[in-house]
Amino acid sequence: MSKKNYYLLSEGILKRKENTIYFVNEKGSKPLPINKIYSMYAYGQITISSQVISLFAKEGIPIHFFNYYGYYNGSFYPRESLLSGDLLIKQAEHNIDFSKRLKLAKLFVEGAAKNILKVLAYYKIENNIKNTLTELNESSKITEVMNVEGRIRAEYYQYFDDILPDEFKMEGRSRQPPTNMINSLISFGNSMMYASVITELYNTQLNPTISYLHEPAERRFSLALDLSEIFKPIIVDRVIFYLVNKKMITEKDFNQDLNCCLLNDKGRATFVKEYNKRLETTIKHKDLGRKVSYQRLIRLEAYKLKKHVFGMKEYDPFVIWW
């Protein structure tokens, strides 16, 4: 029986009866068999019993929590059953050794930029991002690498106006909170991407708090931020372009006031459905010679990083080939 991601988009209570979880809300009680749950995303006020937490811990199921704005709040991260002291030491070594960290940081930006270029090529948009990317060669500090990444993404966001209809104009990137519809979609999607990467990292032996491009910090899984950069263009952004251009998401799917713009319940449900559909979409892997889902690609990326820090094979960031 294949497992899948579950998304709780309304207020409710998670209860346990034997080995079945029930989500109870104003619409009734819905059974969620534990052997079908891969991970869970919870939006809104969710009450969870200790019995549910115990079962999720036993089965190794992470739960990701998001706030009113759709921002990631935190995760229930089950006790790690795949701990590796050797890997932890190697991960830390590649952060502490500046030359090793700088190399990985540049590779994450290179992978993200090349996927951005693939997206822009799909929409036949000429750009100067490739020229900006060459500046990585001269970058000798992590802050300089981050600066290159920031300028690439800023230029990339300018081209959103060429892909999307006028009512979804970017007008600059705004985050907390987003001030217009396109910024709302980007923030919502990026939060989902971050949580998806956390899930995949949980299923490897990698420590999610040791990162290379982003600074390791308290209260965040910074390695998930590193890996998210590679997949945001080909998962989150493509979902946004599809939903908006197909008019599956319109102005009616947002709550707007003077201070912020947020997806309403209907808009969130539409986005989540398409995002999950994208994660489950399979493509034929040119190296493996078989079909893999986008969700699996994230896990494979983590495995590649693991091989790199062990010195088994140089890390080569994933770049879409279509």
UniProtKB/Swiss-Prot annotation:
Q: Which residues are involved in binding Mn(2+)?
A: 149, 214, 229
What keywords would UniProt list here? Answer: Antiviral defense, DNA-binding, Endonuclease, Hydrolase, Magnesium, Manganese, Metal-binding, Nuclease
GO terms under biological process: defense response to virus; maintenance of CRISPR repeat elements
Single GO MF descriptor = metal ion binding
Q: Which domain of life is it from?
A: Archaea
* Required co-factors: Mg(2+); Mn(2+)
The record ties this protein, via InterPro entries, to: CRISPR-assoc_Cas1, CRISPR-assoc_Cas1_C, CRISPR-assoc_Cas1_HMARI/TNEAP, CRISPR-assoc_Cas1_N
PANTHER family, A to Z: CRISPR-ASSOCIATED ENDONUCLEASE CAS1
Q: Which family does it belong to?
A: Belongs to the CRISPR-associated endonuclease Cas1 family.
Q: How does it assemble?
A: Homodimer, forms a heterotetramer with a Cas2 homodimer.
- What HAMAP family does the record tag this protein with? Cas1
State the function annotated in the UniProt record: CRISPR (clustered regularly interspaced short palindromic repeat), is an adaptive immune system that provides protection against mobile genetic elements (viruses, transposable elements and conjugative plasmids). CRISPR clusters contain spacers, sequences complementary to antecedent mobile elements, and target invading nucleic acids. CRISPR clusters are transcribed and processed into CRISPR RNA (crRNA). Acts as a dsDNA endonuclease. Involved in the integration of spacer DNA into the CRISPR cassette.
Q: What is this protein called?
A: CRISPR-associated protein Cas1 1
Taxonomic source organism: Methanobrevibacter ruminantium (strain ATCC 35063 / DSM 1093 / JCM 13430 / OCM 146 / M1) (Methanobacterium ruminantium)
Q: What lineage does UniProt assign to this protein's organism?
A: Archaea, Methanobacteriati, Methanobacteriota, Methanomada group, Methanobacteria
